[in-house]
A protein has these predicted regions:
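Core nucleotide-handling region used for phosphoryl-transfer chemistry
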Residues: 1-345
């Protein structure tokens, strides 16, 4: 799978009114709903630039000047600080709005690219990454025997929904923490990585992994991916009493393996697995999104869960298009909208 298309050319598939709203309406793009101004005069069939949530609209780019007063965040990119507005899920007039729609000519296009075209670079947009909460120096780039942890949202896979409903998948709770990868090379040396970088052996990530003996569960050529959660991490939104890992994927020689093949002890540290019948892929995309909305209590009693990740069983044949979208991770997610809006995400 290629890197995430933060900004792409998409076609508006529908326009819905908002009760009691004179100036705004809802545009449908893929599986997303985005609140837009009626003065944009958009209609079904129009091609537009769609910006996904987590997009950082840089303050130095005049195309995004109007957004900066809504709030800004700063992140480090290489040796530079970049400040801008980060797109989050919001609720307006009782309607969830996810992402941003702009006209292509607002971005400087004098022609209309095909639907699906990745225009992230042209839009000059970055994916916002929260600062690493754990200590430890970066000593190299991500080089583990696995893919970087990533799962597309179901809203981007609407064209494959009928195929997805024919496949077997394991539903697991998406746990809100810091993504970490632990691997063992062929010489038996253990390495630890953040989402994009290798960290030194004295990092807090490594120390916590060792505390739970994850390093002793690995074999050469194996990698375990997990969320580090608890006090001091991502505001501890799940209110856990202590820091701990939640394993969500295990790999051997760049191939993801099913949970029943994980090393002894690792399933005890896994993210919670949900009932496959209760969370079978049925109905419409909107039905599934609505079902996840409000999910709670699977990690911490009575607290909202972040969402669900469906991991496809590895022995299934996928169409070329779906395989390209999912990549080697072979999973996708639905995020709990109530969780997003409650936490300003």
């Amino acid at each position: 799978m290629s890197s995430r298309k933060l900004v792409s050319v998409q076609e508006i598939t529908g326009i819905d009114p908002i009760e009691g709203a004179d100036r705004i309406e809802v545009a449908r793009v893929l599986g997303w709903r985005v609140v837009i101004g009626k003065d944009m005069h958009l209609k079904p069939g129009d091609r537009v630039a769609y910006f996904e949530t987590d997009s950082l609209l840089p303050a130095y780019d005049p195309r995004y000047k109007a957004f900066q007063e809504r709030g800004q965040k700063t992140m480090i990119v290489g040796s530079m600080e970049v400040t801008g507005h980060v797109l989050r899920t919001v609720k307006l007039r009782g309607v969830y709005s996810q992402g941003l729609i702009m006209r292509l000519d607002e971005l400087g296009f004098r022609y209309t690219p095909p639907v699906g075209t990745d225009i992230t670079d042209k839009a000059n947009v970055l994916k916002y990454e929260e600062p690493l909460p754990m200590g430890g120096a970066q000593i190299g780039r991500f080089d583990a025997p696995c893919s970087k942890s990533d799962a597309p949202r179901l809203q981007t896979l609407t064209g494959y929904w009928d195929e997805l409903k024919t496949l077997e998948a394991v539903p697991t709770v998406k746990v809100d923490g810091t993504s970490t990868t632990l691997s063992m090379d062929e010489r038996g040396q253990v390495h630890v990585y953040s989402r994009n970088w290798e960290l030194d052996s004295m990092s807090s990530n490594m120390q916590l992994a060792k505390r739970f003996q994850l390093d002793k569960m690995l074999w050469p050529g194996m990698a375990a991916q997990f969320e580090l959660c608890g006090p001091g991490i991502q505001s501890n939104r799940l209110k856990l009493p202590a820091q701990r890992p939640f394993v969500f994927a295990v790999w051997k020689d760049h191939h993801k393996i099913d949970r029943d093949q994980w090393p002894t002890g690792m399933p005890n540290l896994a993210v919670p697995e949900l009932d496959e019948n209760e969370w079978a892929l049925t109905g419409s995309v909107d039905d599934m999104i609505a079902k996840v909305d409000g999910l709670r209590g699977n990690v911490t009693k009575d607290r909202l869960d972040e969402g669900i990740v469906w991991h496809l069983h590895e022995d299934q044949q996928l169409s070329e298009g779906l395989a390209n979208e999912l990549g080697a991770n072979r999973c996708f997610k639905i995020i709990n909208n109530k969780y997003l809006t409650k936490n300003g995400l």
